């Protein structure tokens, strides 16, 4: 009896974990972006932001093209424009800024994958007083690698434990040529000037990204 109860508990826990990584398409904090045959849905997990506080999203990448695409799922950055009140969360790498290739996840043709990303709100220098410049909107930007041909061997090498793949000049050039930045619609947010108490994941060290596979072929 105890064994059966354990199995049921594990199944329920696994189901809850899977549900947590899905984008709620009915959530008012859902954003959408589409560039040709790549669609991205994202759900902002906070409606109130604060300085040094967390910002996190669940996002789904759907590849509607006939070729495989890839995303550097462990790379994220946060930028704040005080003039426009826009905070931008950028996911993936627009350029290869390091000497090692970032972790890449491939999305095959016809496939959907879901990830988590986030970081720490920073750059809000004047958050108090009548002339405070604080975020009023969040825009999510996702960088997608449209052509993975030049990175196939590198991606395969990354599957080995503790693998480190050096960036070559050809990789750098192909990345610039193949990268596509997809902007999702902006989402309104509130701002809190209350101090942050809990530690959060930084943009340079994002939390673990999870990918859920659905109907896609080999790439």
Give, region by region, the residue ranges found by the protein language model:
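Hydrophobic h-region of N-terminal signal peptides that target proteins for export
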Residues: 10-20
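Low-complexity, acidic Ser/Thr/Pro/Gly-rich terminal tails and inter-domain linkers that flank the onset
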Residues: 21-51
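Beta-strand-rich interaction surfaces with strong enrichment in secreted/lumenal proteins
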Residues: 45-47, 101-107, 129
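Solvent-exposed, conformationally flexible loop/turn segments
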Residues: 51-52, 108-112, 118
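Short, solvent-exposed loop/turn segments enriched in Ser/Thr/Gly
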Residues: 52-58
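Asparagine-centered strand-capping/turn motif at beta-strand->loop junctions
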Residues: 59-66
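The feature marks short-to-medium sequence segments in extracytoplasmic or secretory-pathway proteins
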Residues: 66-112
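Terminal connector regions
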Residues: 121-199
């Amino acid at each position: 009896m105890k064994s059966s109860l354990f199995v049921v508990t594990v199944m329920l826990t696994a189901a809850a974990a899977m549900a947590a990584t899905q984008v709620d398409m009915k959530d008012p904090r859902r954003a959408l972006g589409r560039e040709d045959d790549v669609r991205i849905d994202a759900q902002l997990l906070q409606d109130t932001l604060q300085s040094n506080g967390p910002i996190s999203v669940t996002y789904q990448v759907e590849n509607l093209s006939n070729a495989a695409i890839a995303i550097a799922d462990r790379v994220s950055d946060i930028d704040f424009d005080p003039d426009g009140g826009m905070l931008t969360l950028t996911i993936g790498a627009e350029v290869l800024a390091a000497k090692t290739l970032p972790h890449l996840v491939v999305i095959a043709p016809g496939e959907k994958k879901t990830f988590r990303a986030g970081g720490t709100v920073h750059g809000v220098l004047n958050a108090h007083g009548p002339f405070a410049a604080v975020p009023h909107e969040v825009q999510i930007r996702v960088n997608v690698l449209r052509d993975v041909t030049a990175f196939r061997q590198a991606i395969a090498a990354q599957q080995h434990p503790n693998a480190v793949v050096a960036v070559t000049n050809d990789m750098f050039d192909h990345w610039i040529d193949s990268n596509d930045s997809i902007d999702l619609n902006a989402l309104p947010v509130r701002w809190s000037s209350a101090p942050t108490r809990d530690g959060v994941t930084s943009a340079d060290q994002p939390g673990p990204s999870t990918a859920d596979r659905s109907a896609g072929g080999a790439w």
